[in-house]
């Protein structure tokens, strides 16, 4: 009788192990696809930023050439006017020509270059390392840390977390950790996911039930992005990632506690 009971316990444990493994494999597959989508969108954003940088450099080059050309023409015109009127009003023409020349020489193209804005934003984001607000409203607990971790209940099985999981209270909302631009909003596995660009830094907010921003929108620090959905266990859990271009960073060293 005892042997039969022991066998039943073993069978039950094996059954639970198989269920846990199946659930884990499903979760692993979902996260692999999600991260592949995030990687692709971030690569596209990096490529777009590089195109903008090159286009701005070309615009500046052309504007500088045009400025120099105009300045050269004005110098030539001023010299011609001085020569023409030298006999009648030499001093007056010289002053006028010099004034025109000086005014044009100090005039430079007026640019609001997004590349310069990106660089400034990247610098200010980096300067706030360790001081960024938590990306979730209300009280919270970090339930899964960055990097590899052992799966509870499965001996020797590890998963690799590209960010951190933050569990909050029911009704918790995701919020931007810094000012930036919403560059992507996409749905995956029934949940919304948002990418916000802060210069060369990107923050990713996953597992949202709804969103309250749109693509291309400028957001401020602590601005609500959407409501956090419940995970498989019924908890409101936000998956949060931080990247510097393609490099994955540990968010915990950047967030204030």
Show where each model-derived region lies.
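Alpha-helical oligomerization segments with coiled-coil/rod-like character
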Residues: 1-91
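Short glycine/threonine/proline-enriched tight-turn/helix- or strand-capping micro-motif at secondary-structure
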Residues: 112-131, 143-176, 199, 244
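Conserved, short, structured surface segments that act as functional micro-motifs
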Residues: 194-197, 215-257
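Generic structural motif
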Residues: 134-144, 172-182, 222
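Zn2+-dependent peptidoglycan hydrolase active-site motif and core
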Residues: 176-210
């Amino acid at each position: 009788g005892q042997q039969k009971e022991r066998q039943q316990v073993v069978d039950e444990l094996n059954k639970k192990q198989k269920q846990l493994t199946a659930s884990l494999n499903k979760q692993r597959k979902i996260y692999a696809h999600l991260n592949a989508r995030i990687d692709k969108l971030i690569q596209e954003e990096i490529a777009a930023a590089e195109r903008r940088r090159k286009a701005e450099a070309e615009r500046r080059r052309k504007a500088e050439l045009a400025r120099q050309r105009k300045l050269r023409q004005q110098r030539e015109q001023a010299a011609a006017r001085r020569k023409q009127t030298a006999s009648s009003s030499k001093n007056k023409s010289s002053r006028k020509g010099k004034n025109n020349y000086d005014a044009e020489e100090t005039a430079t193209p007026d640019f609001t270059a997004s590349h310069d804005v990106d660089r400034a934003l990247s610098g200010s984001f980096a300067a706030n390392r360790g001081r960024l607000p938590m990306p979730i409203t209300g009280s919270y607990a970090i339930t899964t840390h960055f990097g590899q971790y052992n799966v509870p209940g499965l001996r020797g099985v590890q998963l690799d977390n590209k960010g951190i999981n933050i569990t909050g209270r029911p009704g918790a909302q995701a919020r931007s950790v810094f000012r930036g631009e919403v560059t992507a909003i996409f749905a995956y596995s029934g949940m919304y996911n948002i990418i916000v660009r802060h210069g060369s830094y990107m923050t990713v907010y996953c597992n949202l039930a709804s969103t309250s921003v749109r693509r291309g929108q400028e957001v401020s620090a602590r601005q609500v992005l959407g409501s956090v959905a419940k995970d498989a266990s019924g908890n409101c859990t936000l998956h949060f990632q931080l990247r510097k271009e393609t490099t994955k960073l540990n968010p915990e060293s950047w967030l204030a506690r």
